């Protein structure tokens, strides 16, 4: 994922909050993070047993927009108040992709990271992060329950981080150019030739899961039950679908501003998006777009603050995890960045009182339609044993797909 901070425009963009279908089935919303029997062992890393005084410093790896200190906008600053309250000086390093974040955490120079689900299991099983003692993070108690103990942020019922914010990957289309209104991801897969050269897709190996989700609904013979748990045959089918899609794709995007530009210029008329992108395009009034969750359901992301296994400043990191999930600050981050806050009390603190409705912040049913990004591992996430393909294999295949 490659994202940058934005000022939100939800009041102007309510029209984009279109659910394309009430269907979508179960996404595994009740699945916990417990590994299957005979699954890989998690490296033993002790969790903090008690909270002490801050060490005076905190070194973070984070997505742009997650540690704002007033530099980008003097009215947007939750870092300096944190420093004043705790005595922990924040030094943050922007990670542009999940792969870059994993590499930075391997350096041992950082106390914590705001990891997306396509990085979390790599960090956990790599022994790079520690389990979190949630009793030491008071604001965790009121984090949305549907974000706790999930496959991307916990193992064996043990949380390995504190949920920060989340969002769905939506299907967006120009409703002046695309007719009839699509209700299925088939519009960018089997029927994509109708919009040849105008289709856009997310540029990451994790996008293979979007193809797998589509096949899960339309090719039951493949027996896909989790789009992040693909054996070789299932992966080959997803790769074949994406290679067929490739000839119709005009642009792959990872920087959200590029997709905004593509839809506004007319270079793209249909493809995967985030709510914030739909909001921006709608607000700019350069293209008429609608976006929502198709009938198959969708993938999405939920970011997690994780503490390094060998954090030099663990007390400051725990203080940060509690601070960033406090109601007022979590609301600030969500509105600045353009995502649903994890904190259930944050919706009372947003400046735009329609914000949480637009982002479905408290909507468990909406969340349950989402297969959140989870790192593919050889040990199948659906419990089939060691027959699945891992993230490294997906990365190789993604390179081949793009050609």
Predicted regions located by residue number:
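Early extracytoplasmic/lumenal segment of secretory-pathway proteins
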Residues: 39-122
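Mature extracytoplasmic/periplasmic domains
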Residues: 303, 307-374
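Periplasmic-binding protein-like
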Residues: 141-142, 241-245, 275, 285-306
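Extracytoplasmic ligand-binding site segments that recognize negatively charged/polar headgroups
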Residues: 59-74, 109, 114-264
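A ligand-binding cleft/hinge motif common to bilobed small-molecule-binding domains
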Residues: 119-122, 272-288
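C-terminal motif of bacterial Sec signal peptides marking the signal peptidase cleavage site
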Residues: 17-22
């Amino acid at each position: 994922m490659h994202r940058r901070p934005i000022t939100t425009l939800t009041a102007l963009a309510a029209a984009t909050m279109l659910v394309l279908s009430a269907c979508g089935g179960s996404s595994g919303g009740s699945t916990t993070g417990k590994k299957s029997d005979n699954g890989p062992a998690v490296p033993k890393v002790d969790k903090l047993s008690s909270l002490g005084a801050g060490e005076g410093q905190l070194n973070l790896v984070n997505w742009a927009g997650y540690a704002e200190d007033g530099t980008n906008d003097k009215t947007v600053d939750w870092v300096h108040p944190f420093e004043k309250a705790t005595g922990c000086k924040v030094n943050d390093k922007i990670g542009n992709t999940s792969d870059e974040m994993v590499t930075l955490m391997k350096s041992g120079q950082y106390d914590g990271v705001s990891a997306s689900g396509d990085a979390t299991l790599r960090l956990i099983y790599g022994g790079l992060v520690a389990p979190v003692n949630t009793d030491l993070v008071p604001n965790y108690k009121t984090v949305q329950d549907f974000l706790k103990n999930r496959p991307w942020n916990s193992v064996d019922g043990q949380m390995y981080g504190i949920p920060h914010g989340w969002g769905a990957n939506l299907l967006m289309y120009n409703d002046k150019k695309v007719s009839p209104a699509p209700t299925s991801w088939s519009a960018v897969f089997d029927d994509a030739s109708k919009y040849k050269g105008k289709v856009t897709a997310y540029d990451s190996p994790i996008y293979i899961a979007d193809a797998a989700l589509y096949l899960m609904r339309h090719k039951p013979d493949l027996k896909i039950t989790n789009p992040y748990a693909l054996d070789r045959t299932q992966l080959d089918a997803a790769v074949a679908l994406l290679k067929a899609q490739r000839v119709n794709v005009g642009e792959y995007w990872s920087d959200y501003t590029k997709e905004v530009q593509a839809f506004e210029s007319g270079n793209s008329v249909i493809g995967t998006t985030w709510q914030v992108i739909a909001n921006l395009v709608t607000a700019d009034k350069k293209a008429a777009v609608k976006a929502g969750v198709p009938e198959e359901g969708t993938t999405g992301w939920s970011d997690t603050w994780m503490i390094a296994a060998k954090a030099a400043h663990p007390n400051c990191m725990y203080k940060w995890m509690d601070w960033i999930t406090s109601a007022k600050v979590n609301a600030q981050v969500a509105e600045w960045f353009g995502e649903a806050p994890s904190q259930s009390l944050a919706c009372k603190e947003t400046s735009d009182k329609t914000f949480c409705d637009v982002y479905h912040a408290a909507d468990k049913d909406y969340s349950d339609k989402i297969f959140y990004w989870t790192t593919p591992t050889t040990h199948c996430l659906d419990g089939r044993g060691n027959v699945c393909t891992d993230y490294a294999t997906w990365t190789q295949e993604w390179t081949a797909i793009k050609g």
